Regions:
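Non-catalytic interaction/Regulatory regions outside core domains
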Residues: 1-124
Length: 124
């Protein structure tokens, strides 16, 4: 794992996201973050990573149970305080999660996440 490269890629990514709160690249099987973090001191990204890995794993299993050829892309979780967009990447082994403020532009977030996906996969 090229931790320095991952940090660089995610720092560039953060600069493009309006309403950024947190992002993480997380191993779905163990819930451990391999890069990322939060600008909000009240938001513990490591706890979120661990719990959302369970959600991402269930999402992948559900897609494949419905149709073995169905490939998961992303999922959206909303709360009164944030929007969480998670993209399943790297052969369903990792997810790239982004938390933003509720007034953020989701379409732009999705586009920017897709833009950085290959760089993130290379840095894993």
């Amino acid at each position: 794992m090229a931790k320095g490269k991952m940090d660089e890629v995610l720092e560039n990514f953060r600069k493009e996201i309006q309403g950024f709160i947190s992002c993480d690249v997380v191993n779905i099987s163990d819930g451990l973050s391999i890069g990322g973090g939060s600008i909000d001191p009240k938001f513990d990204a490591s706890i979120a990573a661990a719990y959302y890995a369970t959600v991402a794993s269930a999402y992948v299993k559900t897609c494949h149970a419905i149709d073995k050829t169905m490939e998961p892309e992303d999922m959206l979780i909303t709360t009164d305080q944030m929007l969480l967009l998670m993209r399943v990447i790297a052969n369903n082994n990792y997810f790239f999660g982004l938390a933003v403020t509720p007034d953020s532009n989701l379409a732009m977030c999705r586009l920017i996440m897709k833009k950085y996906e290959e760089e993130i996969i290379k840095a894993i």
